[in-house]
Regions:
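A structural signal for beta-strand and strand-to-loop patches characteristic of beta-rich domains
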Residues: 1-218
């Protein structure tokens, strides 16, 4: 950021500022996939390519979506990970099976199980990438890896993790301590909105509050 203050002949000050960025790469790639996608609605997605200023530039992007390994059971994330573990993972799971050992809930640490779909797209074509009928997504955790080359031939890689849930199913989409979903994010007067709660734990009590502004309805 550069700030310039100039005084004119009348002694009045005028301020002007400009911002700029410096980067080792001239291309950024991203996608339109949300952190949590609804199974029935996940039929297409887009891939974007931009320069450092955020302006669109055409690029050929290779992409691949992978299914990730799920934990064997749900765990609650610890408030703070120990600097040094005094127990092995196996010992900890026997002592505190519901309390995470460290990285169980971190998607970035999950192993890849299988490749679901892959392809290549030129971002000059703004048509969304359709998920074919032969591609079978299920509820769970996924990872998309995208690769492209900038104008200097440097390879750019972007990785994003996401989950797929099914609001029509009575089963948990994946092992987790709590699950909350709405049938719609907005509604008109007289409409009905279904609220779904879930947990992989048994004998769970749910406390909830419905508010309008700061006033509690329920």
């Amino acid at each position: 950021k550069i700030d310039a203050v100039v005084s004119d002949l009348n002694g009045e000050s005028h301020t002007e500022e400009r911002t700029f960025s410096i980067s080792r790469q001239s291309l950024w790639i991203s996608n339109s996939i949300s952190d949590v996608e609804e199974l029935a609605d996940f039929k297409e997605f887009k891939i974007y390519s931009e320069n450092i200023s955020g302006s669109h530039i055409d690029a050929t992007v290779e992409y691949e979506i992978f299914k990730l390994e799920e934990p064997s059971h749900a765990t609650v994330a610890r408030l703070k990970t120990a600097d040094k573990q005094m127990y092995s993972r196996e010992e900890w799971e026997k002592l505190c099976p519901a309390l995470g050992y460290g990285d169980e809930n971190t998607l970035e640490k999950r192993k890849i199980v299988s490749s679901i779909m892959k392809g290549s797209v030129n971002t000059a074509d703004t048509t969304p990438i359709a998920i074919g009928k032969k591609v079978k997504f299920t509820t769970g955790s996924y990872r998309i890896i995208m690769k492209a080359k900038d104008k200097d031939g440097n390879e750019i890689t972007d990785t994003a993790n996401f989950r797929i849930a099914d609001k029509t199913s009575d089963k948990m989409p994946y092992p987790m301590p709590s699950y909350f979903a709405l049938s719609k994010s907005s509604a008109k007067v007289g409409d009905k909105v279904q609220v779904r709660f879930g947990s992989s734990f048994s004998d769970v009590t749910v406390f909830y509050t419905i508010q309008i502004g700061k006033r509690d309805l329920e």
